[in-house]
Amino acid sequence: MMQQTDAALAALERLAVHHSRFSQMYLERGLCHVARRDAPAAIFDLRSAVTLNPALAMGWRMLDGLYRMTGDLRSAELAAGHFAHLASLPPQIVHAKVLFGDGEIDVAEELIRRFLLEAGNHPEAMRLLAQIGHQRNVLDDAEALYEGVVAMVPDHDAARHEYVQVLIARHKFPQARAALEPLLKRDPRNHAHRIQAATISVGLGNFESVIPEYRAMIAEIGGDTHDARVRRADLNLWLGHALKTEARTAEAIDAYMAATANRPDFGDAWWSLANLKTYRFSAESIAVMRERLEDPATAETDRIHIAFALGKALEDAGDYEGSCAAYSRGNTMHRASNGYVPDVFETNTREQKRVCTPEFFAKRTGWGLDDPSPIFVLGLPRSGSTLLEQILASHSMVEGTQELPDIQRIVHELQGRELNFDKPLYPGALEDLDAAAVRRYGEQYIADTMPNRILGRPFFIDKMPNNFRHVGLIHLILPNAKIIDARRDPMACCFSNLKQLFAQGQEFTYGIEDIARYYKTYVELMDHWDAVLPGRVLRVQHEDVVDDLEGSVRRILDYCGLPFEDACIEFHKTKRSVRTPSSEQVRQPIFRDGLDQWKKFEPWLGALREALGPELAPRAA
């Protein structure tokens, strides 16, 4: 019998090399360790199984017994509770949950929808459908379903927690706070609830208050177990982000280093150090990153983060060839899994040009909300938009906010739920809107952005870069808004994007062909806006700002109808929260050093120059 168990374990070890996220493999491995009477190994694998797929009832049942046997009664009670909950559910729901947990989302959705049709509203079935909606990023459906679940079962804490997560994902921070209140009242010391409360505070721009809260939670986690180290690492990461945003850089570095000390393979923490842009890695840290990058046990997402961090470390050390190789490795890994389809943006651009013509806008003169308060700073990432935001936010009449999602939310509403990338509903849907609907969208934008306007100044900045795709919509619903296109040298911009690992989105930045195609289409679309809305968009070239700061500032303020203020020249002295990767750079005076940084990599950027073409990237004479 023992020989059979050993053979099974050997086979499962081979399977784990290629399928490290397969919950059933961990479950089977845990059962083999139970047969061998190896409780610690069994607990480790069974915990891995239920972490990957919480619907594995057998895993929870076995963990209950193992925890009791080893004297961990608190964990035993939690495992028993999970098992009892699953045992109380109809088998169709449990089956669908298992499928969902193993990534069989289409089958799980079909099964649970059929169950709901036959059995009527069941809170746990509705919750699973909401989870599927969240996974698919159909957040409006997920929100409605969770709202129904917590209305039916107000004390369903797990569903309420997930409901709050969806509200946070939709940037509905006041609503999220209200939904979270019952959880905080029932269990005020619960870390999961307190972390959500901190996330909401961050979303509302209140970074200062979360710093002591993160530190308190870190202090409350004792012991040296794997779980304790992971939790401390996560909290130190979030603490570092808050400190960085508040310009407390030295403390942020300490927090990020504490995260790597708790989890040496924590790619996000290594990248956060690199993403400060001003931090320099020690030889010891570089050695740790190299080791973890090559370790097969390091998760893929951590390897991606570490590759980008190593690229930055080697760049700062002057090893440009090694740096370029590390960046390329990170991009290749990320591109393999991000599912980016270049044709989608290009199709949308063609549709924007077809719909948004001079005649289209002429027929709608006088439409929209005449509120002049928004200042949109848009363009490609890494084009100097954070610098422009900092300059404008240094003015006494202008409030800096963040990259606001509210225009994109309107686009999603116009797009509808049935996405057809070959023939999208948006922007064609703009042709069907009447004057009242257009005005409502303008009012909706102003109302939705109001929670971010903490200082109450007359003007505010929306720095979402991708809004350049929606200049036509912005002009239609907010005809008096200001629109600034942040532009940068194509080679410098594209290479800077290839070096950057974004927290989310910007999937076009992980391949040379992708970023070059995107840049060319961006230029084509901005040329279109200039043609159909002449003078509407102010283009600001980053290199011009560096060469002539005062002249550029006066030009920007004049376009915005704002009087000149010296504070805009001394923008680096402005004390405000800055959330983007350039936060440390805009807290310093302007230097020319960064303009030609890409040229140090020029021997390895021939493919990028070729992809951009001679018009955008001419060879030096």
Language-model segment annotations:
Residues 1, 35, 69, 101-102, ...:
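Register position in tetratricopeptide repeats
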Residues 18, 52, 69, 85-86, ...:
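Structural marker of alpha-solenoid helical repeat scaffolds
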Residues 24, 58, 90-91, 124, ...:
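Start-of-helix register in tetratricopeptide repeats
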Residues 271-274, 286-297, 306-374, 423-457, ...:
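PAPS-dependent sulfotransferases, especially Golgi type II membrane carbohydrate sulfotransferases
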Residues 367-476:
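Phosphate-binding active sites in nucleotide-utilizing proteins
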